Design a protein with these regions (language model features):
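Classical secretory targeting signals
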Residues: 1-26
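Low-complexity segments
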Residues: 26-133
């Protein structure tokens, strides 16, 4: 009898955990106010070989929009490129789409971030034999 109670309790715990994971999978940020225009700024010097520029973006917090400056970062693995995040319009709200690393630069809203990110693709460098130029 104890085994049956334990098995049922374990099954219930697994089901509740799965429900919690599933419910958090679709969390996103939406705002009814458009983000401000991108500021004009100078790109700092690249700190060394293999660094990729990740452009700044407008984030949204309790006090409204705030600017997150761009920075040079090392890719997490050779061959990966950064796709910037962007604010898109849909269903009457602005929705933020997170940036991500991948084997190619994906869609980032057609936003001209400059510094190689002109709205389509990336023209800021390339991978060759495991090194970024």
């Amino acid at each position: 009898m104890r085994r049956i109670i334990f098995a049922r309790s374990l099954l219930l715990a697994v089901m509740l955990l799965a429900l919690a994971v599933k419910s958090s999978a679709g969390v996103f940020l939406s705002v009814v106010i458009a983000p401000p225009a991108l500021p004009v700024y100078e790109q700092p010097f690249c700190p060394g070989d293999g660094y990729i520029w990740t452009p700044g973006y407008w984030a949204y917090g309790d006090d409204g929009y705030f600017w997150v400056p761009g920075t040079w970062v090392l890719a997490p693995a050779p061959g990966l490129l950064w796709t910037p995040g962007y604010w898109g319009w849909g269903d009457g709200v602005f929705i933020f789409h997170e940036g991500y690393w991948g084997p190619y630069v994906g869609f980032y809203g057609g936003i001209n971030y400059g510094f190689g990110y002109t709205g389509i693709g990336y023209r800021g460098g390339y991978w060759n034999n495991g090194a970024f130029f």
